[in-house]
Amino acid sequence: MPPTQAESVIRSIIREIGQECAAHGEIVSETLIAFMVKAVVLDPSNGFNMDRTLMKSDVQNLVKLCMTRLLDTKNPSLDTIKMQVYFDMNYTNRVEFLEEHHRVLESRLGSVTREITDNRACAKEELESLYRKIISYVLLRSGLGSPTDIKTVREVTAALQSVFPQAELGTFLTLSKKDKERQLKELTMIVTGIRLFNRDCGKGGEGIDDLPAVLHVAIPATMQHIDYQLETARSQVYRYTAILEKAANDPLMRAELQPYMLKEALYNIRQYEVFLQIILSDIITGAQEVEMMTKQLGAHLEQLKMTIKSKIAVPTSQVFPIFIALSTLWTSLQDETIVVGVLSNLFTHIQPFLGAHELYFPERVMQCHLNGATVKTDVCRMKEHMEDRVNVADFRKLEWLFPETTANFDKLLIQYRGFCAYTFAATDGLLLPGNPAIGILKYKEKYYTFNSKDAAYSFAENPEHYIDIVREKAKKNTELIQLLELHQQFETFIPYSQMRDADKHYIKPITKCESSTQTNTHILPPTIVRSYEWNEWELRRKAIKLANLRQKVTHSVQTDLSHLRRENCSQVYPPKDTSTQSMREDSTGVPRPQIYLAGLRGGKSEITDEVKVNLTRDVDET
């Protein structure tokens, strides 16, 4: 059958089963129906052959079997499957959840962002409208207050005007779209930091909840509630296990317990325990993050107070980074609030799938079968065989791992979620926790633990036999596929959450490693002083910078009255007399010629006797 035709047939089967269930008053999701279809086909007792095309009679039989299972409300196995499907569809690890949450926020702000970045305002009214949109954007992005609250809007407007006055809108409009978006985010963080600081000083903070106080109350309360439910579930597990362990050696008791479906109830509550541990682990991680962020928040607020004090003006280079850091921390606290809420909601919604264990196995019947049985906790079982260890010499062809010889011993992915494979196979499905201290068997790149040394030896003699038994048991009880993490053996049952974390299934032990040593070329540390300055004026500049004279009050002026009290003088270098001359004026004079002529007057008859007298001064006399 072509893939497209097969998918069409499966969809029609799922749709038909959903309609039949609805007719019987049971609303079932398509995901659960699809899981049940796979489970019914996988069960060998139903006789479906995956290698041949399904006939009409096969489809009718498949629908009938699925209907029977889905409408059997007294079956713990169905409750376990419902719990697994719900958890897989609703649980996401912290990192991916926060990434998706931020992506959703960005998509919701997309229309507001485009209205601002695509705006081409020119008139005064248009610029005022744009500024109001920026205020709304800051409020929506920060999540601190409602845009319809007048007091909150006024507070945000005042904070925004202090860092981004309306007069700067012209410069903002000239930026590229990417730069506008970046500046909007920066403005949001700065304004958020200002509001948080004002709230801490008691001068503002309208509409801002005290998130650290809320989380410090909510997280411990949630952890305490989950711890209580976890201990209650474990107590029930230990009682079920004790009865099943007692029945393993008593055929009559096994036959008597058959109608109560005790093993299915054990699988149900074990799966519930696993999910509670996952939720509790995430909440503990969140509590550690909140504690660290609360300390950082207080430190940044104190740093701001020391920087600002009572000053009228402070350089933006000093306070803006702190405001941004405050905003980032507060956003992380908001994320933690959402994570805790989602995990609490998930915890509440999986409780109904725990099943009515009182209905499955009444207390009077349980007390009757507990007579003569020893109820042991998982910790007690591990302590009993803590000293019993596998002798590696007994199995030369198999590899055994121990804590003292394996570097990443605690990080190995143990098969069957750490339960003893031999006990499960030998007792037809009893779940007992394995003890890694006995030794971890490495077989075909997979790791197995056992609850006792004898169980380890029995499994090691024929591993394939017991692995096949576990696989066949999982085909009959499909809830075991997720409970025992058998997804690699049943590819069609890999949940989405497991597919995302597929890489973690291949952690390999580090039992051997290469190491080398080498003497350092330079034993002594270098003596180069990077802060050395040869320039005297550079040293003076640094000294002035360290003194921060801009924030100090200096006195260098005296009045007529104050000069009598003390002398005030400043001097850079010792005084010295010196003079320089760049040009000197000088001149020279040549004697002016003075020559006189006499005897030029005379008659016509007389001869003129001309006398020439030279009165010019000598050059040496000048």
Curated annotation (Swiss-Prot):
Localization per Swiss-Prot or TrEMBL: Cytoplasm, Cytoskeleton, Cilium axoneme; Cytoplasm, Cytoskeleton, Cilium basal body
Cited Pfam families: FAP206
InterPro entries assigned: FAP206 (IPR021897)
One of the protein's GO biological processes: sperm axoneme assembly
Which UniProt keywords are present, listed alphabetically? Cell projection, Cilium, Cilium biogenesis/degradation, Cytoplasm, Cytoskeleton
Report which superkingdom the organism of origin falls in: Eukaryota
Q: What's a single GO CC term here?
A: axoneme
Specify where it is mainly localized: cytoplasm
Ranges for the region named Disordered are: 570-592
Cytoplasm: is it a keyword of this entry? yes
Q: Which family does it belong to?
A: Belongs to the CFAP206 family.
Function of the molecule:
Essential for sperm motility and is involved in the regulation of the beating frequency of motile cilia on the epithelial cells of the respiratory tract. Required for the establishment of radial spokes in sperm flagella.
The protein's name: Cilia- and flagella-associated protein 206
Name the gene that codes for it.
CFAP206
